[in-house]
Amino acid sequence: MTTKYNAGIHHRRSIRLKHYNYRSEGFYFITICCKNKECLFGHIINQQMQLNDLGNYVKQCWENIPMFFPQVRIDEFVIMPNHLHGIIEIIEQVKGKCNLPLQLRATQLPQKGTSQTIGSIVRRFKAGVTSWARKNSEIFDVWQRNYYEHIIRDEKSYLQIYEYIQNNPILWEQDQLYVD
């Protein structure tokens, strides 16, 4: 018997905005962290990120998100030893569960996930990385539960976040996720 989720019992609360449509066009700043802040993706050497095999696979999966979610554009991102920061742009709002013309839905294109929210994008990305890690390494749990997102509402915020992402390897030792 499975127990239905109950916030009072499970002590979890959503960190998402209650009435926000996470399919909406716009820019989103995403942070996804490794479980227990483990440094699984490589190391910072001379203020530059040196990716290991898993880190390179994370990079490949992140860059390939638009193949599975054609309404998404990948903007600036950085893979750090124990987390990823990235800007995702939704370039067109998805209407309903499928935004493809009827004649293309089941024939010419590979199957895509039905949900097109930021949450479904992150979920698919995390699942792909975890699956690869389990098959190709001794790592079983890659990610902490959930992810952090910030809706970028103006150019000033976008530019600050863009600069933060670019400087993240340089400022690694001051990062709140830094572990020695």
From Swiss-Prot:
Name of the protein: Uncharacterized protein HI_0554
Gene source species: Haemophilus influenzae (strain ATCC 51907 / DSM 11121 / KW20 / Rd)
SMART domains cross-referenced by the UniProt entry: Y1_Tnp (SM01321)
Record InterPro entries: RAYT_transposase, Transposase_17, Transposase_17_sf
Single GO term (MF): transposase activity
Superkingdom of this protein's organism: Bacteria
Coiled coil: none
GO biological process, one term: DNA transposition
